[in-house]
Amino acid sequence: MFMKRLAIALIILLALAVAGAYYFNQYWIHRYDAMIARQASIYRLDPDLVWSVIYEETYFSPWKKGSKGEVGLMQVTPAVGREWAAETGMRDLARQMERDPQAVLRDPEKNIQIGCWYLEKLYEEFRDLPGVEARMIAGYNAGPSRAVEWNQTEAGAEPLSIEQFVARIDIPSTRAYVTSILERYRKLKLQRGGATTATQNRNATTGAGR
């Protein structure tokens, strides 16, 4: 009888542990959803794409620091943060970025804001091309100039498909990064019954960008 009760207790504890792990994971990956939605709306981006980028960059760890000085949820560099502050005319934040960029970039909402601003700049670079998401993501990871290089075609040629563009990425880590985000983004949109589109409400006049 004792062993039977012990087995039942262990099963219950195991079930509680599994349920707890599941709900904690759901909390962890969705606790910034409101911030993502708010900033994505300002910069007229699809929040699911922004979410997918953050998932890949840091798995929602706001304190993560990259090997090249990237900081926070979207792994923003101080240089990009200073560019954002200068272009948006936020003098107080520009001064803060000069004094202590780490403090600004560790703030989850500021980090998401700057990351969305940068993604919108990349959207504007490639907006007329099919599969703009792939170009945006590649530029976010490897820099806009490399994304432009990979996107080049002969004069008069058809624009590259997503598959053709990804195949041209000659940095393995960037190719894996782009592929992973696109697949996660696609699955997320399928779960929600929507189409993959990098931006939302592009005819709106809200937002700021390059």
Task: List each language-model region with its residue ranges.
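N-terminal Sec-pathway targeting helices
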Residues: 1-18
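Catalytic and substrate-binding regions of cell-wall glycan-acting enzymes that process beta-1,4-linked
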Residues: 134-194
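Substrate-binding/active-site groove segments that recognize
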Residues: 68-96, 114-118, 160
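Surface-exposed patches in mature extracellular/periplasmic domains of secreted proteins
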Residues: 49-51, 93, 126-138, 161, ...
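Cell-wall polysaccharide-cleaving catalytic domain and substrate-binding groove, primarily
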Residues: 55-80, 143, 185
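Second-shell loop/turn segments in exported
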Residues: 22-25, 38-39, 62-71, 97-109, ...
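Extracytoplasmic/secreted envelope proteins and their assembly/folding machinery
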Residues: 33, 37, 47-51, 73, ...
